[in-house]
Structure formats: C-alpha cells, structure tokens
Amino acid sequence: MRFFSYLGLLLAGLTSLQGFSTDNLLEEELRYWCQYVKNCRFCWTCQDGLCKNKVLKDMSSVQEHSYPMKHCMIHRQCKYIRDGPIFQVECTIQTSDATHLINA
C-alpha cells in the first residue's frame, strides 16, 4: 500500500510539472530566458501585428514578421527527493534551441 501512495505522489508531481508549457512559462523562467535569448517566441506578446517583449519593458514594440522570432522549447530534468512524508522537486532547465540562438 505504501508503494501506491508513493507512486501517486510521484505522478501528481509529474502532472503538475507538465502543466507548464513553453508557451506559458513560469515568471522566474521567463525572466531568465528572455534576458539572454530575446528571439524566443515565448518572450513576446503580439496583438494586431505588433509585438512587445514580456520581460524587457523598455524595449520598443516590433512588427510581428520583421523581428526574427524563433519557436524555442524548454526542457526540464527533475529529480524527486523524499524527506519523510514530504516530496521536493529540483529541476534544471535547458534548451538546445536557445543555445543555438545565443551562438548565432
């Protein structure tokens, strides 16, 4: 029975992590990535052909198709730490697309 409780908590943790898509990053992640990789599409909010950077507020608006926006994907590697009845999740975040853009 204890195994199933552990499995249930583990799956609940995985489900909550998968709830954050690249299009809707956590604010902390968004600030980190958009400081270094301004070309990622998830850093911008666009309406009626004009796009505004979500993090760099002093950056002027750009036309949607005139700025080289790329579809980047964030990949998370997580480990689960059991400390008694409490589970902790530690994740490292990486993106190969963003690395390519940084080196470009």
Curated annotation (Swiss-Prot):
Which InterPro entries is this protein grouped with?
ASFV_fam_110
Q: What is this protein called?
A: Protein MGF 110-2L
Outline what the protein does: Plays a role in virus cell tropism, and may be required for efficient virus replication in macrophages.
What family is it from? Answer: Belongs to the asfivirus MGF 110 family.
Please report a single Pfam family linked to this protein. v110
Domain of life, per UniProt, equals Viruses
The gene from which this protein is expressed is: MGF 110-2L
Keyword Signal applies: yes
Keyword check for GTP-binding, yes or no: no
Keywords linked to the UniProt accession? Early protein, Signal
Supply the source organism's classification: Viruses, Varidnaviria, Bamfordvirae, Nucleocytoviricota, Pokkesviricetes
Q: Which residues form the signal peptide?
A: 1-31
